């Protein structure tokens, strides 16, 4: 996969060409994912370059703007048989998951509404993880995860899982993370 923040170093077309080259030499099905796409034009460029799935990340936007941005990408991607992941709530950075507490966690109500409004294929949710290195032990809100899983029918995705521990990851999978 390729995240938008890495595109200045490795361009979208170049990443797609490399993966296509090795995919042709392989007898395996290969997926190519564009992660944390913030810019609509770059996400569309990844789709056009042959990425098989994309993530549109409007999680820092107000809910309505995130919905609108996601709907635009879902319509574009689905016409081209590409799956779309989106994110609501906010996955912190480093130790910010301690500071933000429950205020940035995904709620079951917004998860349900978001999925219904956008027709997204999978949903990244915030349950207490953070990108980067943890300062201390992360405290995942498994009760919130169960509540979200009960409300939505799409696969749930966990970002910031690295460093959260095998036990936390296993429990998250048991409760609905794919």
Predicted regions and their residues:
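Alpha/beta enzyme core
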Residues: 1-5, 12-32, 36-154, 166-177
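Active-site neighborhood of phospho(di)ester-bond hydrolases with catalytic His/Asp-centered motifs
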Residues: 156-158
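Short acidic/histidine-rich active-site segments
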Residues: 162-163
């Amino acid at each position: 996969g390729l995240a938008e923040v890495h595109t200045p170093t490795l361009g979208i077309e170049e990443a797609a060409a490399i993966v296509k080259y090795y995919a042709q030499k392989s007898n395996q099905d290969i997926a190519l994912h564009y992660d944390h796409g913030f810019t609509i034009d770059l996400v569309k460029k990844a789709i056009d370059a042959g990425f098989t799935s994309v993530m549109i990340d409007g999680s820092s936007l107000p809910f309505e703007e995130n919905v609108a941005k996601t709907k635009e990408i879902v319509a574009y991607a689905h016409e081209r048989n590409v799956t779309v992941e989106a994110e609501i709530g906010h996955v912190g950075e480093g130790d910010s998951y301690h500071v933000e507490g429950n205020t940035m966690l995904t709620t079951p109500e917004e998860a349900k509404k978001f999925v219904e409004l956008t027709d997204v294929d999978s949903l990244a949710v915030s349950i207490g993880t953070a990108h980067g290195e943890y300062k201390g032990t992360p405290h995942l809100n498994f009760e919130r995860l169960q509540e979200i899983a009960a409300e939505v029918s799409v696969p749930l995705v966990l970002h910031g899982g690295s460093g959260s521990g095998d036990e936390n990851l296993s429990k998250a999978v048991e409760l609905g993370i794919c």
